[in-house]
Amino acid sequence: MNFKSTVITAMCCFFSFAVLASEKLEKPKLVVGLVVDQMRWDYLYRYYDRYSENGFKRLLNEGFSSENTLIDYVPTYTAIGHSTIYTGSVPAINGIAGNDFIIQATGQNMYCTQDDSVQAVGGEGKVGQQSPKNLLVSTITDQLKLATNFQSKVIGIAIKDRGGILPAGHFANAAYWLDGKTGDWITSTYYMKDLPKWVKGFNKEKVVDQYYKQGWKTLYPIDTYVLSTADDNLYEETFKGEKTPTFPRDLVKLKKENGYELIKSTPQGNTLTLDFAKRAIENEQLGNNPLQVTDFLAVSLSSTDYIGHQFAINSIEIEDTYLRLDRDIADFLAYLDQNIGKGNYTLFLSADHGAAHNPKFFADQKGNSGYFDTKAIRKDLNEKLASKFGVADLVKSLANYQVHLNYEVIEANDVEEDEVIAAAIKLLKKVDGVAFVVDMNEAAESSVPQILRERIINGYNFKRSGAIQLILEPQWFSGSKDGKGTTHGSWNSYDAHIPAVFLGWGVKPGKTTRQTHMTDIAPTIAQILKIEFPNGNIGTPIQEAIEQ
């Protein structure tokens, strides 16, 4: 090689390195998390033929769907689900052991986002005394803030406080939730001292009253809702002021007895949430960050859960809600396309849990089901334990399908904890609807199927969970005889099989039917963003969903 060619080669290498050094790592402008509260996986397909092309169908056709995503723990509740999605962790690690839980060391009842050290901003009282303080690990939103030296903006929005606070994490710029007394969006002093002007402006518009004027009638002729039970039935709860749980509904009239709480249990609650999310994008410049870093908007749609609890999963109300939600999602995606740019954002849709059929409905179809009357069973359990040990009130609570012992009483009366647990287990095994009763001190050796054992251990936080875990038979849940509506909390597929759909920047379209987990969502987003996993993560990125 002569001198001239050597110089040319050296110069080429120099400029190649210079180009490489100047290359910028491409990332999406915005990540949007959509959690649809109480959305069973099968809702993606149950009403598929009635969905528009640009809502759920667009997510499925243009995005990646993990069709067999399961929840890794029991019990399956809202606060735990939101925490798990955003942390890739489970209650044993992240500390969120229920919507409410008991601090075992003190016996104190604790709401998942309760923080008495902060005050409401935009509202009054305990409704605003909320923060992520009780969450023990970082979220994917926290990790984004850390990765960008806190230059990214992170905002959480949900009608439910826990649905906005827990996903937004510890380092969020803001989390907003709805004050049911006023219909206003509020926050707490954990985030700020005063509401931004744009939030105050939105609240002044009294958007909820505008939605009430629309009423609630079915989107299509009611006789086309053939996938649902007849409108007037015994399985649904009425609103205050209603004689029957039937369409159409005059929301202005119902407001007189239900106030602004009413919006939570109507499809317009989802519309309200997404309208507020759009306003946040515009005013906070989410996805158009002047520092050119990725922002994160965590949205939870709470109304699907309120409606499901009140009317159950086979109702016309649920079918109509999802048909309307499909339109809302289509509108929101179109908004993102226009304002952030199609292909410039990454979005995922999932759920915090599913829901069971109403037990009476299921029994009327000749299925096995029933109600576990927690209040009556606790009373009976305490009476029988008192007869054996000579001490009253040994059981404090049966919350979260767990037996919480009254340790103050046990210690004061010098009763052996192990003996109380053994006696309680023996009694509970005789109760109708109980499949398994597990001593949490011996969970790893318990004689239950492995999949159940793993979920029980994952859901157990020894500082915040009960001493005994109850597993009920399928289609049994906590409630009184002939209870209306539905609930959730079990390990069964109707509660624990959830959607996990990814769309947009960094996502490879397609689907998989292999088993994945709720804990896989956060690390998947982390890998797309090329940032570190949350610090309590146990999940694995869904590689098939990621554009390499």
UniProtKB/Swiss-Prot annotation:
PANTHER family: BIS(5'-ADENOSYL)-TRIPHOSPHATASE, ECTONUCLEOTIDE PYROPHOSPHATASE/PHOSPHODIESTERASE. Residues 1-21 form the signal peptide. Optimum pH is 8.0 for ATP hydrolysis activity. Loses 50% of the activity at pH 7.0 or 8.5, has less than 20% activity at pH 6.5 and virtually no activity at pH 9.0. The gene is cda. This is Calcium-transporting ATPase. InterPro entries: Alkaline_phosphatase_core_sf (IPR017850), Alkaline_phosphatase_prok (IPR026263), Phosphodiest/P_Trfase (IPR002591). GO terms for biological process: calcium ion transmembrane transport; calcium ion transport; cellular response to magnesium ion. The lineage of its organism: Bacteria, Pseudomonadati, Bacteroidota, Flavobacteriia, Flavobacteriales. It is an enzyme of class 7 (translocase). Its main location: membrane. It is found in: Cell inner membrane.
